Design a protein with these regions (language model features):
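Beta/alpha (TIM)-barrel catalytic core signal, keyed to glycine-rich beta->alpha loops juxtaposed to Asp/Glu
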Residues: 137-326
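Short, well-ordered coil/turn segments that N-cap beta-strands
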Residues: 11-16, 52-54, 81-85, 126-130, ...
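A short, structured active-site edge motif that brings together acidic residues
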Residues: 83-96, 187-192
Length: 326
């Protein structure tokens, strides 16, 4: 597995990130985390490390907090393992009726950011978070308040680095203005089917057809400022790599057929081709792979060894677009 330095840090991390959302029983309500969940998480961590993956992505809301709880219990089963891994989590989403009568919302207040980070530390059974991301933009955010929350957590040794998720170029620039240190990551939906990060450049000045709103300058901001681009849902829930072709749109079917053909030709699993398409982009994209199957990491680790020509990369893009390049 290829390793890279996370920008603005001394953290050597795997190019592929292990997404932990499905741990702790998933989104089924009323689950109490127990020994079975801890054992599953322990096997998940071991399988990821065996494949060379040492970077783990969480959020305080995943599985209603149970994903972090299960991971923490699993981590505790192997004493001394914490220094070998990099833990990242996210905060800022608040569910409906939290507290009773409150709406579903986002919250970047100082109090909530600090409380969320401390809750994650308790559930993960660790003294520090390597990276904390703001999950989704809060329309009521105040840059000064966020900066104060970050400074408090950093001074206490509870969080080492900070980043964002689902933010555009203007939002990143606004937040960075108030911070004393650079943001290290922005996690966005990027994949062969969700290729707005590419389409924004291709379709600029070409009329409105297919133009992705919101991507203007986001990719370039991250590249210019050393913000790691992390891709959530890089496999589109496995649509291109395992779904029946008959269930797909014409563009999806064309992309899936081409992708699966390339996988057979290169002797790698289809997942590796889908991830390698992202890895080929010069922005240094880091896919976040969501799975509870430790064996799947080995299959996807092959992505870092796949070499795409420019022609192969564009062939997949054109198939996924469902129309010729402008």
């Amino acid at each position: 597995m290829e390793k890279v330095l996370l920008p603005h840090t001394d953290l050597e991390v795997s190019r592929v990130i292990a997404g932990c959302m499905k741990l702790g029983g998933g989104w089924t309500g009323g689950v109490v985390v127990g020994e079975t969940h801890a054992a599953q998480a322990s096997a998940f961590i071991a399988g990821a490390l065996d494949a060379g993956v040492n970077y783990f992505d969480h959020a305080d809301v995943y599985a209603w907090g149970n994903a972090e709880e299960a991971f923490g219990r699993g981590l505790a089963l192997t004493p001394g393992l914490r220094p070998r891994i990099v833990i990242q989590t996210k905060c800022g989403i608040r569910w409906k009726d939290e507290p009773a009568g409150a709406p579903h919302r986002y919250d970047f207040s100082r109090g909530h950011i600090v409380a969320s980070a401390e809750g994650s530390l308790r559930r993960l059974k660790t003294d520090y978070l390597d990276v904390l991301l703001l999950h989704r933009p809060d329309p009521l955010w105040e840059g000064e308040e966020i900066a104060a929350a970050f400074a408090e957590l950093k001074a206490a040794g509870k969080v080492r680095r900070f980043g964002v998720s689902n933010m555009n170029a203007g939002q990143m620039a606004y937040l960075q203005h108030f911070l004393d240190e650079p943001l290290v990551a922005n996690q966005l939906q990027m994949s062969l089917l969700h290729h707005g990060f590419v389409e924004a450049g291709i379709s600029f000045n070409q009329g409105s057809e297919g133009y992705p709103q919101g991507w203007e300058g986001a990719l370039e901001y991250c590249r210019l400022n050393g913000v790691a681009l992390q891709a959530w849902s890089p496999l589109d829930k496995g649509l291109l790599v395992g779904a029946p072709l008959g269930s797909m749109s014409p563009a999806q079917r064309a992309a899936a057929e081409l992708l699966r053909g390339m996988a057979a030709e290169k002797g790698v699993p289809p997942e590796a081709i889908a991830l390698a398409w992202l890895l080929r982009h010069p922005a240094g994209i880091m896919p976040v792979l969501g799975t509870t199957d430790p064996g799947r990491f080995a299959a996807c680790a092959a992505a870092t060894s796949v070499r795409f020509s420019r022609e192969e990369w564009y062939s997949l893009l054109e198939a996924a677009r469902g129309r010729p390049m402008p």
